[in-house]
Every structure is written in structure tokens, then in C-alpha cells.
Amino acid sequence: MTTHPDLAAEQAYIDRAYESLEAARSSANRLKGMVEVGQGGTEQARFEREVIYDTVSFRLNQLHLGDASLLFGRIDREPGDGGDTFYIGRLAVSDANQEPLVVDWRAPVAEPFYRATGRDPMGLARRRHFQTRGRQLLGIEDELFGEHALDLGEGAGLQGHGSLIAALETARSGRLGDIVATIQGEQDEIIRSPLPGILVVQGGPGTGKTVVALHRAAYLLYTHRFPLEDQGVLVVGPNRLFLAYIEQVLPSLGEAGVELAVLADLIDTVSVRGTDREEVARLKGDEVMRKVLAKAVRDRKRPLPRTLRLPHGLQNLVLDVHESAEIVRDARRRFRTHNAGRRFVEREVARVLAESSRTPIDPTELWRQVRRHPMVVEALERMWPVLTPAQLLHDLFGSRALLRLAGRKVVSEEHLDLLHRPRSASVDDVVWTQDDIPLLDEAYALLGPRRRKRDDDEVRTYGHIVVDEAQDLSPMQLRMLARRSLNGSMTVVGDIAQSTGAWAHDSWDEVLAHLPDRRPGRREELTVGYRIPGPNMDLAARVLSRSAPDLAAPRAVRQDGRPPRLHRVDPAAGSEGIGRAVVESVRAELAGVGQGNVAIICPRSRLEDISSDLRAAGIEHGVAIEQGLEHQVTVVPVGMVKGLELDATVVVDPTGIIEEEAQGLRALYVALTRATKHLTLVHHGELPEALQPPADDRRSGSDHQVGSPEAVRAAG
């Protein structure tokens, strides 16, 4: 951006806004200090102080910008629309007279900043974008509308083209940043979409679907502060690496109260320590498990096999088989959840035993005397045991007999055997997997809380739920999320073309079938790829044409850039040749990205070898499985890289990725679409067929033309 004649005046306005922001922060800190000093008083006074303290703390959190810029632009309305000027920023700021200096980007008046186009200027005469670093104004970009409109050239259809490109070319930090200054029209439509119902956002790589969903959460909290602040907003991600990657976005937008979680976090009674084979994960995720678990719970409600004769004084109190069956039948009919019926069963057992006495006896007093008797304990354990979800699954999966009893009518015996695992000595010793989590949740829905157990809380529900990478979730995982929706309001985000794992879906209809249907689902699609350079997307599109031929690749904003590099390794060189090629490629990419980051994306089977090769070469790096991308160089298994963005990527062994992953071509497509700048492929021998150029191009020898992959000398 060249020097703009209004640069000094706009810098002065920005300085004034920051001064007012500092004044507001100082005022809030003084008020907080006064509240902290206050002690004693009535209960009402203490309550009021707590409310004030929470309110002030929330406001202080909003006023903390860190390194983020306060302002990023302004809009000037046409004289016929008032001729007003509004400065758009991260949060609302007023001067000492309460005159607005900055309008919150989520306010309705700010909408034209993101949505106005030449065809629909929305009453604007001019839109001005600021390029800033902190509080310093570096440049100004103007867009004129109406009779003053200019030809925008290559940026047509994009708001703030220069600012957008500058933001896209900024080096990655290992954390996802907000896009509040460069939100585009199609993104803003999704962000401001109404709260009720389910909104499905389909978006290819680099379209910004994740960050759009997070900005939508911030927008909904601003627009519907009451009731969402009390009801809560939940963001669910595919893994902890992904959560670490996105965790700073909402706080940077002044919304620190949103809960970020993986599915396992929603069940806090167990820890995930194992992984299921694909065929086991497929079965555990199938909706048929609803019937298996419901039958497993029903199977634990059984009449006595023989009459109970309980010694009591000089007589035996009797509960016969028929009476026990009546009690179980009545309890099944009366109670929706299993554990809720236990008290009724106890009372009925006490009543029948008391009625069998030759002398009158109070059932309540009798129960107090006999409830711990081993024969009574055994009878109740048979008729109606108190169960936790973990106990139910521990017993079920540890017994082939119980599995067949619960599932024989809906699951084949061969598949039931997949669920069996050796019984642990204790439920605390069970190695739970990610795919057990929705089954534990389903079991809790069937069992309910245990009486007088405070740790058995009711399922927490939320006023809005954002689900990222939803295309990979199983029916049982989706049921788990639906159970946490208070009112059916959800934002479901993903890309069918990137659907991988045991439950990869081929359409959003398959996903929506398991989510709340109080209102018809709305669908939006992001079609523009902002992050991935055109040459990288062109290579990835070859894979897409085979893995999901009905889907189109996003249209890349940046058509320039270095073509992907293909680093061929002689098959005779083996793993050592791969290691040398990876080290050479990483060094080349580090030289090209400066302070940016580099990720080596590989099959999980190569993770340790590649890390050892980098260590031997003296390249400091991290291995991202659970932790984030703090290192400049990181080795990431292909199954964990979805949703991340890096400056440069080295994709190792594309053939191995295709062969090892459940949806190999889709996994390779994910791997090829992570780089915002440079992409290198390290491969043994010939490239997989999916990466070969079309036959016509191969015959014409066009594979090495500009915009096509660059071949690197063979290694080995």
C-alpha cells in the first residue's frame, strides 16, 4: 500500500480511540478494586458485589486486546443514507461523553463493511480498510461505490483485497488467528445467520470454515447475550491438537467464556487411553448400539431364579419368584431411567417381605434392619442393580454371554465378538477408547444418575453448539452431541471431501439424520479458497477428482506462488533415502519461509523414523500428537493434521498414506491442502496414480510447465 493522504488524520483518530480504551480499562480496574475492598454487609449486599465483580471482570476481559489491533476500517454512508461515518473495530469504544468512537464489528451498522458490493453498496459511498500493526497504522485501502466506484481488477468480489492478501501472506504462528479485519461477504452471511436451528457449513480446504464458525459463535453471543451467556456455547473439535490450535480465536474477540472440548471431555468419569481397530470403531459408532445397550440394561432387570427365604427372628420372610417378577415388571413400566427405579424396587421388596411375616411389621423398619443382609443384597443385585455407565459396559464387553443376550437379534455373532474384550479385574482398570465415549453417554441416558451421588450430574446442555469436522462423526457421536443441545441450535462445519475415519460420510444428509430436527436444517457453502495457493490446489484437485468426483475444489484467491516440489527417492534407498530427502526438504523449506513454520505430514508408521532422522540432522522439532505446533518444525501424523494450516508442508510417502488410512485418497487430499505457501512431496519411486497429471497432459509433457509440480532430483 502506498502512502495515503489521510494517513496522519486516521492515525490521530486511532490514537484517540486507544486513549479512550485505556480510560475505560482504568475505570473498570478502579471499580474492581473498590468491590474487592468491600467486606461484610448483608447477604444482599454481598450478592450485589459479586454480580458487579463478575460484570467488571467480564468487561476487563473484553477490553484486553493483547497484540491485536483495535480498529481495522471505516465506512462512509451516502448523503441520502445519512452521510454518517462509522469506524469498525474489535469492540465498541466511546469517548468521555459516551459518543461512539468505534463500532463493534458484530453490530448491525457494521454489516456493510463486510457485505457491500458494487451491485449492492448497502448505502455506502466508501469502505476504507486499515492495515495496522498494534496501534500503528501502516496503510489505507479505499473502495468507492456508486458514481465514484473504481474498477477493482483482480480483487473484484473481495472486500479489502490488499488487506486480505497481506493477512494471508503473514507467517503462521502455530495458532489460528481471527479474521475479523478481513471477513468476506460469503463468510459474513454465515456468521450473521439466525440462531435457531442447525446451520451446516460445507467448505473446502482454505475457505475459512473453522474460523468462520468461531466468529459466528462470537457474533451469536454478542447478538443474543441473553440467554446464551447463561445457557452456554460449546465448541467441539476433533482432537486436542486442534483445540490447542484454535484456542486463542474467541478470547481475541473478547469472548473467553465459550467452552472448547473434544467428545471425551464431555464424559469426565473416564480417561481415554486406547484406540480401537477400524472395524470395532465402525460397530461401536453404529446406531444399532442404541438397541444393544437398551437391551443390556433391560437384561439387568430380572426376577429371582428361586424364592428368597430370609431368616428373621423365629420365622422366614418370603419373596417368591412370581412376586419378584411383578416388582420388576412394575418398575420397568414406571421409570424412564434404570437407576431411578431402584428405590421403588427396594420399597416393594420390603413391602412383600413384611406382608409375609406372621406378625405385623412396618416395611420401613424392616428394611432398615435387613437391607444390608447378604441375601437381600444379592437379591437386589439380581433384580435391579445400581449401575454406572462404566460398570454396564465393563460387564457387557467382558462377557460373551451378555453380549449375545443383548445383541443377538440386531448384530451378527461375528460382529458381537468384535466388542468382546478380556474382563479387567476392576472397572477402574479398563482401557477406554474414543469410540467408547458415546456408548458411555448412551448408557448414562438409559441408566440416569445414582441416588445421592453428587458426581452423577445431569447432562450439561448448551444454547448453541459448534461442531467442527462433523463429517467424520459416527451416528453415536452425533447422538451424544444432540443430547447436549438445549434447543436444537447448532453450527455444523466440515468438508465431505475430507471425510475420513471409520465413519466417513458421503453427504450431509447422513449427518443431519442424527441431529435435532426441530427445524429444517439450513445449508451454506464456502466456495473461495483464501489460504491455499492455486498451484497447490491444482495438485490436490487431481486427488479430489478421484476421491470425491462430485465435489468441486475451492476457487483459489492466490493463483501465483511456487509450484509444489516433487522429491523422488530411489526405491533401492529404502527408509534411509526417505530420511535424507525429508531432511533436505525441511532445510529448503525453512530457508524459504523465514520465521514461518514447517510441518512434515506422514503416515503414523513413519512418525518415529522421521523424528529420529531430524534429530540426527540437528533439526529441532516437535511431534504433534496431543500438544500443539509450538516448534517451527513439527512432525504430524496425517490423521491429526485436519483443520490445521502451516506455512510450508513436506508430505512424506503419499503411497503409504493411501494404503494405511481408512480413506486413503481423502487423507492424502487433506495432507496436500495444509500449506499456505510451499508444498513438497517426498515419494518412493513413481507417484501414486491419483497424483499423476491427466493422460493428455502426460502425453504432451506438460507436467513441468509453470504452475505444475517441480521435479527435484532423485535421492538415494
Residue map of PLM features:
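Extended, charged low-complexity regulatory segments
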Residues: 1-180, 184-189, 702, 706-716
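P-loop NTPase Walker
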Residues: 2-24, 65-68, 133, 150-152, ...
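A structural signal for short, well-ordered beta-strand segments and their strand-loop junctions
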Residues: 74, 139, 391, 492, ...
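Alpha-helical nucleic-acid-binding subdomain
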Residues: 94, 221-465, 472-480, 488-489, ...
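Short glycine/proline-rich turn/loop motifs
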Residues: 163-170, 424-425, 520-522
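Phosphate/oxyanion-binding active-site loops and adjacent basic polyanion-contact surfaces
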Residues: 175, 179, 209-213, 289, ...
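Amphipathic, well-packed alpha-helical segments that form the structural scaffold of globular domains
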Residues: 184, 188, 192-195, 218, ...
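Conserved helicase motor core of SF1/SF2 NTP-dependent helicases
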Residues: 226, 230-231, 240-266, 271-281, ...
